[in-house]
């Protein structure tokens, strides 16, 4: 990071913020450091070209944008990165470059920041011209000459005459652009131009190998060509000899800068007699006078030239194969180094990794062993079922989760419907809160066995035990069962199945609900006079009302009030949204005072308002009993 400029860091940070990893890597590969692009950045960009979800035009545009920089270092490194991707990247990259009309418009580039900028600007212009020519060549022949198959069955050796005469000049133009780089060993003074020279050196070897195979194919077909084709072929061969001389000079520069001698191919010159034979054959086709030459001599000369060029091609192929082998060995060495580094890291911290890996398992195992899971929907065990048999007289087919449901819903509703007369005499601080059922003082059975024999299902709501339900205390002197008079005595509460603790149950669809127990405002109390007065008032004695005085104030749809259709009315949650109450089936006595309506709601037209306890200011609406002929709770007695 020390060689990077502040501009490079800001640009990389901007791409990091925008989330463009490709643009950030392009910026990192083309910094102002006077050195070649780093291998890690080039490898990342190569991998990006192989990914189908990477936008190749965006990658190329990022590189083109970097070439507009005024610094020769940034521009040169941008060209090197582009060249590297064209050679080693996916073919989609060079296909996109070939589809563009123009690539690099750097023919007038000049960096005037220093003397080195002037010198490097010259090579930048030459280098950009070669890259443009490389893309144009791909556009014309639809393949890269540096990547074509070589050998006896290669692309250039099996090409027909017409196509061969059109393809070889394209290779010549690309070779001319490469050799025009024309750098000396004294000018390779920095890492940037050295990186560009290495890429050009590898391209020169591969390109000349394809060029050499094209010439071999041309010579083999030369004596069978027409006159015009022979003329074109002779011109191509003369240019080939010139470029062979230039490529030899280029390879000498590579040897001078320190490239291994084994990586430089040996170029074998064709015999000069071959050129004379080609010229004589063309002259004979044109009708000129030539010295006599036999077909055998021409065949010998041609075979010698082809063998010389074939040896050159073999040398070029060996160099290419050696380069591939070196690349494979380098990758294997890197992989081996990574494995050794990984083994060292594991050897340093063996206990820590094992401990951290085993800790969660051991902790969870210990938790499982110490805290067994409770299945709230499982059936009771055999021991619990045996101990529950004496108390399970009426609930033989009762589901195990019924007590839990009643513990949440039914018990608090019954216990808090009327409240206690003594406790409710004092107004609550918050009239909108339901009075807690815990304030009701009830005698609780001392039978502890009922709790010890409870199944785990009963304990599914730990800490939320059901509120006790008030039982009416029968009078010592009077034991009157008024419910049995009308034949609707409930049998569901005849047996105490809870051992002293009431155990509410959920009624099914085909089972009638039991008569609701009266809250602490009891019909029958310890005082005989008050009990008789309440009973007489409920029966309507002395007010002249008979059973035939039943009136229906609304001609609408009748709704049954008893049986499975009965639903308790819950107090409204707010003072302005009162619950709609259905009109009673039987009219109340005219002398019965209505009291105050709960929460100050006016009575409905054509119906009797809900009766509430007169002494309460904020009380809840009364639950309508299922028996229309039963006692009406909350009515007061007036003696006529």
Swiss-Prot record:
Pfam families: ANTH (PF07651)
Biased composition range(s): Polar residues: 544-554
InterPro entries registered for this protein in UniProt: ANTH_dom (IPR011417), ANTH_dom_sf (IPR014712), AP180-like (IPR045192), ENTH (IPR013809), ENTH_VHS (IPR008942)
Interaction with PIMREG: annotated span: 221-294
Position(s), cross-link Glycyl lysine isopeptide (Lys-Gly) (interchain with G-Cter in SUMO2): 238
Reported function: Cytoplasmic adapter protein that plays a critical role in clathrin-mediated endocytosis which is important in processes such as internalization of cell receptors, synaptic transmission or removal of apoptotic cells. Recruits AP-2 and attaches clathrin triskelions to the cytoplasmic side of plasma membrane leading to clathrin-coated vesicles (CCVs) assembly. Furthermore, regulates clathrin-coated vesicle size and maturation by directly sensing and driving membrane curvature.
Name of this chain's protein: Phosphatidylinositol-binding clathrin assembly protein
